[in-house]
Amino acid sequence: ELTTFVHRLPDGDDPFVGDLPVAMAMATTSAVHLDDSTEVVLDDATMAELTHLADVLEAVAIPVSAQVPPALLDALARGDDTQRALEARISAALNNGVGHDALSLPSLPLDPSTAAAAGETDLYTEWLRDGEDLLATTTNSSARRTTRLIPDDISQGGARLLRDLGTRLLVMPVSVYDY
């Protein structure tokens, strides 16, 4: 899906309103899978997606807000040489001065709507803080809580939980909000 913003240049009588700020948001789609000993599994598809993320972060010259499960980045950092090298690429790209951001997510997948409906807002908050700590440890950059990419439906309770935890912008595809 492509959304186009039109920024009209002022004519002779219009005051200058500034340049149109441009940014990009992206999220990985690989799920976090745990093995029998509760270790995160990094399969070939996940590695390919994280490699693509590193490629994009290294290549673009505009700020990117990247939403990646902290457990995946932590598994890379604790993995073999190839995995650690990929984590180092992602960390370096997030800190390369372009203005990239890592968006906050819980340490392990926990849907805010499900947490709100089950009365587990404290657990969600704890896991969110743990995820932010993992991101800070693995990427040497602080996580941004103000924006959240929402790929699926979100309930009012889930949106309220995110709002109460500092989220100010929900970015979602048309299929989620256009009923």
What are these regions (language model features)?
Residues 11-12, 52-53, 133-136, 159:
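Generic recognition of flexible, low-complexity loop/linker segments
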Residues 60-151, 157-158, 164-165, 177-178:
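Metal-dependent polysaccharide deacetylase catalytic core of the NodB/CE4 family, i.e.
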Residues 103, 169-172:
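Short hydrophobic alpha-helical runs that function as membrane-insertion/retention elements
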Residues 171-179:
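C-terminal active-site subregion of NodB/CE4 polysaccharide deacetylases
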